[in-house]
Regions:
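Glycine-rich phosphate/diphosphate-binding loop of Rossmann-like nucleotide-binding domains
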Residues: 1-23
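Catalytic cores of soluble, metal-dependent hydrolases
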Residues: 19-22, 26-170
Length: 170
């Protein structure tokens, strides 16, 4: 599974987005991320690998990149996303890429990269180890009956973290 977080629609080739959709991959627009970074937590919670490209951060917050532009993630949102990535009980690798020290006039970009790493580590230390693996006995179960499709939607809520999971029918 692959998810791209923070693409800018007017800079992204529509054929690329169409290909991602055909491959059943996801891509979240920058506007969706900026209007509520917390909505990215379930996506990042399920991540095994996170690659964070500095070019996704707007130039006013991180100019140490040759492709820096006026729009992108702000530093606060980037740090929130890094923490969510660290909080994933599944994550095996988090990488921060495309910082260019030669373009970092006042070392502000390096400071932001350090903050991103700190937030990812803070997320790792905040992991709850509550991924439902085998037994769901500890979890609160919620069943939503969808009469229109003759299907139940089942949610499980962790008593440890108050995080939710949804059962996906086979």
């Amino acid at each position: 599974d692959y998810t791209n977080i923070g693409h800018q629609g007017y800079l992204t080739d529509p054929d690329t987005l169409e290909l991602l959709e055909k491959m059943q991959f996801k891509s979240e627009r920058l506007g969706n991320v900026m209007s509520g970074a917390h909505r990215m937590e379930p996506i990042l919670r399920d991540a095994d690998l996170v690659s964070f490209d500095a070019s996704s951060i707007r130039a006013s917050d991180h100019a140490a990149h040759s492709e820096a532009g006026p729009n992108g993630l702000d530093a606060v949102t980037a740090c929130q996303l890094a923490r969510y990535a660290g909080m994933s009980d599944r994550v095996k690798s988090i990488g921060f890429f495309e910082h260019n020290p030669d373009l970092d006039q006042r070392n502000l970009g390096a400071q932001l990269m350090a903050q991103l790493i700190w937030h990812a580590l803070d997320g790792i230390y905040a992991q709850k180890a509550d991924i439902p693996k085998c037994s769901l006995d500890e979890y609160t179960k919620y069943v939503i009956d969808l009469d229109e499709v003759n299907q139940d939607v089942i949610f499980h809520k962790s008593p440890r973290s108050d995080r939710w999971w949804m059962e996906v029918p086979a």
